[in-house]
Amino acid sequence: MSSFANRDVISVRDFTRKELEELLSHAEEMERVYERGGDDRLSGKILATLFFSPSTRTRLSFESAMHRLGGDVISLGGKEAASTAKGENLADTVRTVEHYCDVIVLRHPKEGAARLAAELTDVPVINAGDGANQHPTQTFLDLYTIMKEKGRIGGLRIGLLGDLKYGRTVHSLAYALALFGAKIHLISPEELRMPSHILEELEQIGAEVEEHRDLEEILPDLDVLYVTRIQREMFPDPEEFERVKGSYKVTRELIEEHARSDLVILHPLPRVDEIEPDVDELPQARYFDQVRNGVIVRMALLDLILGGG
């Protein structure tokens, strides 16, 4: 029986390296299922997506993954979710929805919402993002993409660029990279540096971490560059956003002049203006491969949780 069977997925911190390796290994098997067009191993199972804050890619990725394994999907999102949030508390919502499904995928603007939902329900809860806190399945697909592109994670020099203060993807990813022994380079304006509690946590697990303000200076040394957008909606102070927006821009010229030919550029998407469109044509650009890998990894995760692998 898989260690993921009937398990909640709330934070990367809930998993050991061995467990993450189990998921990555199963994703390799699931990629072959994906390439065959899927199968029906989760027939009769129902996934509920509850999205109380905006999402396109994550929600569609989970729904696609479930359908490709023969399962069904019910959804609450958009205006309907906003209305529900106003008239019914989260606890009542998840306690109701658990009777309609076998697994819940939840996105909520409040940090800790996914953990609360998991404590209240008997069906597994998967965190699809809770405020600026965690986004574990994005980290899983990021790890899988890096492993596919580079053949390993340990020892790689990986740069995390952009909003490291409010960006939940990098909060999850930095911890996972540390578990695998990657060398982490944090690149951001002073105002958007990684929160001190995360830096302290990385230090406690023996991570090799360096902070930088200048992308051009460190770029030639990187194996992977993970770019994040600066999200207006994450800033409690609009003036702070205005001060830091547009702090970094990855251009074709920058990559061609300063990056290694085997650099891998990743981005959780959507982007704003932090990666110029003509970078897409470069061999280093792998962010659309991430999208494909996201479906595969979520297929693997759902199979391990609901089918036991």
UniProtKB/Swiss-Prot annotation:
Chain positions recorded as L-aspartate binding sites: 86, 168, 229
Biological-process GO terms, alphabetical: 'de novo' pyrimidine nucleobase biosynthetic process; 'de novo' UMP biosynthetic process; amino acid metabolic process
Keyword Transferase applies: yes
Coiled coil start-end: none
Top EC class of this enzyme: transferase
Pathways per UniProt: Pyrimidine metabolism; UMP biosynthesis via de novo pathway; (S)-dihydroorotate from bicarbonate: step 2/3
Catalyzed reactions per annotation: carbamoyl phosphate + L-aspartate = N-carbamoyl-L-aspartate + phosphate + H(+)
Keyword Transferase: yes
UniProt xrefs under Pfam families: OTCace (PF00185), OTCace_N (PF02729)
EC number(s) stated in the UniProt entry for this protein: 2.1.3.2
Keywords: Pyrimidine biosynthesis, Transferase
Binding annotation for carbamoyl phosphate: 57-58, 107, 135, 138, 269-270
Gene Ontology molecular function: amino acid binding; aspartate carbamoyltransferase activity
Family annotation (NCBIfam families): asp_carb_tr, PRK00856.1
Family membership noted in the UniProt record: Belongs to the aspartate/ornithine carbamoyltransferase superfamily. ATCase family.
Subunit structure: Heterooligomer of catalytic and regulatory chains.
Function, in words: Catalyzes the condensation of carbamoyl phosphate and aspartate to form carbamoyl aspartate and inorganic phosphate, the committed step in the de novo pyrimidine nucleotide biosynthesis pathway.
Protein name (record): Aspartate carbamoyltransferase catalytic subunit
Organism: Methanopyrus kandleri (strain AV19 / DSM 6324 / JCM 9639 / NBRC 100938)
Gene designation: pyrB
